[in-house]
């Protein structure tokens, strides 16, 4: 019966990188000012606490959904970068893509018949139910290893220069540093057919998305400010980091538009790259840790997710719920193979909610009558901890 009610059945899920157009379409406000509140204590429009991003003050209504604090989930905004910056989480992927494509024509450094061979292999694995992500990745890695060995491009015969990655986000060709703008330009020119061989689905994901031109700004509910006893506001670590990003981004735009010397523009560009990198991960190897004035390291996005105290292990896997306990399983030679031993204290304390009906009424009455007697702990009888009457 239920099977006929379901119009469609999900058979697979594709994960994709979010592109700049989609970030802007999901955004409810463009953030351009680093200031948060005005003199009267109200959020500044187009600032990091703009009321279009949600509200955290009781009584105020969100300007996007018109809901109050406890009903509004929050909404994303966005920051437009003056110059592109590299997402440090994808540096190795960018290196693989650049190393296996031509620096001149941006074609994959494999003859066309080899490209067709790998493409057909990946398509067969994708269509086959027996195919797995692991086998696809093996073929993709094999194609990349084969392409990296090429000394000249088989399509335009241009000689290839070895690319190196200075962690976390600096790419060099024979000592010359590639700017994020050059990296993005080369990634944009890679044809869709070659991208499939590299494991990309060009209909949903392009490699240039790994070089950011737009940064999503998380809702206010994700980074709420707190009011101290003195009456002053203390902003969240993510808000502090976004303030740094906005200020440097504004200075970079002003200097670039004013025709400042290239050295000054490059220094500000590197500083923007640093702030964006530490915004994602404040423990990135090879760069200094961003800190408060007190010296405490900022807790940015990756630090909120990973590790024992992170969102997954602490708040999702290890959350506290009713009718459950965690205890050591007791070994016992008298237990059946399909049984586990549980300490008596946990067994008596934990309750299983049972709805009384005509089929179990007599059994429930017996449980109430023969309930556990603390004066006779040797006589174990399952009991009832409490009863909820319908009236």
Where do the protein language model's features map onto the residues?
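Conserved core architecture of multi-subunit DNA-directed RNA polymerases
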Residues: 1-391
């Amino acid at each position: 019966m239920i099977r006929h009610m379901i119009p469609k059945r999900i058979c697979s899920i594709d994960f994709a990188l979010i592109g700049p157009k989609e970030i802007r379409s999901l955004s409810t406000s463009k953030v351009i000012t680093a200031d948060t509140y005005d003199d009267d204590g109200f959020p500044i429009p187009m600032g990091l606490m703009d009321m279009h991003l949600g509200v955290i003050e009781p009584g105020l209504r969100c300007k996007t959904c018109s809901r109050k604090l406890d009903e509004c989930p929050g909404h994303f905004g966005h920051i437009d970068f003056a110059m592109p910056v590299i997402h440090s989480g994808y540096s190795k992927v960018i290196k693989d893509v650049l190393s296996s494509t031509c620096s001149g024509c941006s074609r994959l450094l494999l003859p066309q018949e080899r490209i067709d061979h790998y493409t057909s292999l990946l398509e067969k694995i994708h269509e086959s139910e027996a195919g797995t992500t692991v086998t696809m990745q093996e073929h993709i890695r094999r194609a990349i290893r084969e392409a990296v060995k090429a000394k000249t491009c088989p399509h335009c015969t241009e000689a290839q220069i070895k690319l190196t990655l200075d962690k976390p986000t600096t790419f060099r060709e024979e000592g010359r540093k590639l700017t994020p703008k050059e990296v993005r330009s080369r990634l944009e020119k890679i044809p869709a057919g070659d991208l499939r061989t590299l494991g990309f689905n060009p209909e949903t994901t392009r490699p240039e998305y790994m070089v950011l031109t737009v940064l999503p700004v998380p809702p206010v509910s994700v980074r709420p400010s707190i009011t101290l006893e003195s009456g002053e506001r203390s902003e969240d670590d993510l808000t502090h980091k976004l303030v740094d990003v906005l200020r440097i981004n504004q200075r970079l735009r002003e200097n670039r538009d004013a025709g400042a010397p290239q050295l000054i523009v490059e220094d500000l560009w590197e500083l923007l790259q640093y702030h964006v990198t530490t915004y994602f991960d404040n423990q990135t190897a090879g760069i200094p840790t961003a800190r408060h004035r007190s010296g405490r390291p900022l807790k940015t996005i990756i630090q909120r997710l990973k590790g024992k105290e992170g969102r997954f292990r602490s708040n999702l896997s290890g959350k506290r719920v009713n009718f459950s306990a965690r205890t050591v399983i007791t070994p016992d030679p008298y237990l059946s193979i399909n049984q586990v031993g549980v300490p008596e204290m946990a067994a008596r304390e934990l309750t299983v909610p049972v709805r009384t009906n005509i089929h179990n009424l007599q059994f429930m009455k017996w449980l109430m009558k023969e309930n556990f007697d603390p004066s006779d702990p040797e006589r174990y009888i399952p009991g009832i901890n409490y009863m909820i009457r319908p009236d």
